[in-house]
């Protein structure tokens, strides 16, 4: 059964009781990474294995995300700033104990690539907050795996160096 969550705004990413923050450097440039995050929403399961499906709303102002474990998020996009930031709030979910959740992806140039930063900001009942804090290392592992998969998806394979064996 889906429940409505507290309608927080972007500033919640800085003030939430629980904040999980992860970052990675990708070889692809910011416009390419941003396109995968914000435009090609349906491609998310191909690089973020915790996600079973991601479908944009008809008006483009939100999306529905289903996780592999059965959790469903109905989301509203809070920021869609090409090549720099993509953020959304969860409006309703079937996840127990959650009261508010916002996620923000920020992109910045890193040489020819992108520094990708993901903030998951949440609030909920005390057991939920504790569980999320304890899950932090696993969420970080999932993020690092997603960043690697996204990087492989966006970066074309290089031809072998002359004289190398393949």
Regions found by a protein language model. Give the residues of each.
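A conserved amphipathic terminal alpha-helix motif
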Residues: 2-5, 121-166
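Hydrophobic-ligand binding "helix-grip"
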Residues: 45, 49, 53-54, 68-115, ...
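Short aromatic-glycine motifs in intrinsically disordered, low-complexity regions
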Residues: 60-68
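Short, P/G- and charge-enriched loop/turn segments at secondary-structure junctions
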Residues: 8-12, 63-64, 92-94
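Short structured motifs
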Residues: 7-8, 19-20, 59-61, 73-74, ...
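Hydrophobic ligand-binding cavity/cleft-lining segments
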Residues: 1-55, 166
């Amino acid at each position: 059964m889906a429940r409505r969550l507290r309608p927080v705004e972007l500033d919640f990413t800085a003030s939430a009781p629980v904040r999980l923050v992860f970052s990675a450097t990708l070889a692809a440039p910011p416009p390419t990474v941003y396109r995968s995050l914000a435009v090609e929403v349906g491609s998310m399961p191909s690089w973020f294995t915790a996600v079973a499906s991601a479908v944009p709303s008809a008006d483009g102002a939100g999306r529905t995300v289903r996780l592999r474990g059965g959790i469903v998020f109905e989301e509203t996009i809070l920021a869609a700033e090409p090549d720099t930031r993509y953020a959304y709030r969860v409006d309703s979910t079937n996840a127990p104990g959650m009261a508010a959740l916002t996620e923000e992806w920020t992109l910045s140039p890193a040489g020819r690539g992108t520094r990708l930063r993901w903030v998951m900001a949440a609030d909920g009942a005390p057991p939920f907050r504790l569980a999320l804090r304890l899950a932090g290392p696993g969420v970080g592992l999932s993020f690092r795996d997603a960043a690697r998969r996204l990087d492989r998806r966006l970066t074309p394979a290089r031809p072998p160096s002359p004289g190398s064996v393949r």
